[in-house]
Swiss-Prot record:
SMART domains: HATPase_c (SM00387), HisKA (SM00388). InterPro entries: ArlS_N (IPR041610), Bact_Sensor_His_Kinase (IPR050398), HAMP_dom (IPR003660), HATPase_C_sf (IPR036890), His_kinase_dom (IPR005467), HisK_dim/P_dom (IPR003661), HisK_dim/P_sf (IPR036097), Sig_transdc_His_kin-like_C (IPR004358). The modification Phosphohistidine is found at H242. This is Signal transduction histidine-protein kinase ArlS. The lineage of its organism: Bacteria, Bacillati, Bacillota, Bacilli, Bacillales. The gene is arlS. It comes from Staphylococcus saprophyticus subsp. saprophyticus (strain ATCC 15305 / DSM 20229 / NCIMB 8711 / NCTC 7292 / S-41).
Length: 451
């Protein structure tokens, strides 16, 4: 089905609405106007009939002349005089075109009636005359042809006016619809250009229409988000490929080493297998974290949400880590009252381990980790501080990006792949939390998580 242009549709709608409005308005006006004119015709005929009755009440019939009767008649009228038996006594008219002469039946007289003769309409007013001087009937024949011609002229004028108004409306609608759709057409052309040339093109238009200007702003913002998302996705693929390439090359190198000398040399075989298994573990962890990030990007909260008392969870994690890393000092300053948040317990533990593990990696000299919980303004905060190498201020805004590492060589030696903080931030955001970083190079780094 062929789609119509918005400009054509707008013009058709406005023209149709205008035509229907004028049509209905004209019908209503003509209806009331024709009724008013008809009442005027009836009033005029009744006045003439009343004058005729008064004339015969004041004069003997023998003294009434046609001139007297004509003086009582209005325009386009004829009068006929009947006795009580229905016999016509006289008639006169001021309009020779009125040839219609109705008869009356004394036993069945309608005072006001409309009759037709040769496709002409007449208003008939019949009055009974009772006076000492004459008894009978006066009949006024009032032509309605002038009234009909006037009403027909009104219909014709309304039709001409409607056609002219509709035509003018169509022209105006075409002009305005062209003005309204012009920015949309320009936007469409610009979008096609963007599709051909890429995200670097932006729609730069000012239409003086709030709606279309807002649409352009929204479109440009959407394009910026798409460009950013596309660049992040491309960078993500490049970084993931790089991270996977290194351990795979190491594994391939050691497999070649085993194939060449390891079959006969047990030491080379064992060393190569250990290194290959270590790299396989790194790959497995990397893939698991990538899958977790992908799931989190879909705003997934598949875990069981429960009330978690964070002081107990942190104390439990610190106890386990202290036994595993006895050379580290963990200082926990817990809020004196229980602090409960609604979160998936596994996600909370994972987030906590990521931050503590990150603090331990970058504090290899002092090996002193501080953890503090607070409650302020109904907000629960967790602060994790290490006293290691710190983060340069220019790098702080990027540390939550995937695969981003402040010191790539150091991070790889420590077993990092740049995904941990991204995962932790996703967990925090999924649970309506925020994260703030404060750091000074070679002094400290503090991660503050707020729920």
């Amino acid at each position: 089905m062929k789609q119509r242009k918005l400009k054509t549709k707008w013009m058709l709608i406005t023209t149709t609405i205008t035509f229907l409005t004028i049509f209905l308005f004209s019908i209503i006006i003509i209806f009331f106007l024709s009724n008013s004119l008809r009442h005027n015709e009836v009033d005029e005929a009744e006045r003439s009939s009343e004058d005729i009755v008064k004339l015969f009440e004041s004069k003997q019939i023998e003294h009434v002349t046609p001139l007297d009767l004509n003086a009582s008649l209005g325009n386009f009228q004829k009068v006929m005089l009947f006795n009580e038996d229905g016999h016509k006594l006289m008639e006169t008219s001021n309009d020779n075109s009125i040839t219609f002469s109705p008869n009356i039946v004394p036993t069945n007289v309608n005072r006001i009636a409309v009759k037709s003769d040769h496709k002409k309409d007449y208003l008939i007013i019949t009055d009974h005359i009772e006076s000492p001087k004459f008894n009978g009937y006066s009949v006024i024949v009032h032509s309605l042809e002038d009234y009909k011609a006037l009403v027909n002229s009104l219909y014709f004028i309304a039709l001409i006016f409607g056609v002219i108004a509709t035509f003018i409306t169509a022209i105006i609608s075409y002009f305005f619809s062209s003005q309204i759709t012009k920015p949309l057409i320009l936007m469409s052309n610009k979008m096609q250009q963007i599709r051909r040339d890429g995200f670097q093109e932006k729609v730069e238009l000012s239409t003086n229409y709030e709606e279309t200007d807002n649409l352009i702003v929204t479109f440009n913002e959407m394009m910026l988000q798409l460009e950013e998302s596309f660049n992040q996705q491309r960078q993500f693929v490049e970084d993931a490929s790089h991270e996977l390439r290194t351990p795979l090359q190491i594994i391939q190198g050691h497999l070649n080493l085993i194939n060449r000398w390891g079959k006969k040399d047990a030491a080379i075989l064992e060393e190569s297998l250990d290194i290959s298994l270590e790299e396989m573990t790194r790959i497995t962890k990397l893939v698991e974290e990538l899958l977790l990030l992908t799931k989190d990007n879909n705003n997934s909260r598949d875990g069981e949400i429960e009330n978690v008392e964070i002081n107990q969870e942190i104390a439990s994690r610190i106890k386990s880590l202290s036994q595993l890393h006895s050379d580290y000092t963990f200082e926990f300053d817990a809020f004196p009252k229980p602090l409960n948040i609604k979160i998936d317990r596994y996600q909370f533990e994972q987030m906590l381990i990521i931050f503590i593990d990150n603090a331990m990696k970058y504090d290899q000299i002092n090996k002193y980790i501080q953890i503090q919980t607070k409650l302020r303004n109904k907000q629960i905060s967790i602060e994790i501080t290490d006293h290691g190498v710190g983060i340069p201020k220019e790098d702080i805004e990027f540390i939550f990006d995937r695969f981003y590492r402040v010191d790539k060589s150091r991070s790889r030696k420590l077993g990092g792949n740049g995904l941990g903080l991204s995962i932790a931030k996703k967990i925090i955001e999924l649970n309506n939390g925020t994260i703030h970083v404060d750091s000074e190079v070679d002094k400290y780094t503090t991660f503050k998580i707020t729920f």
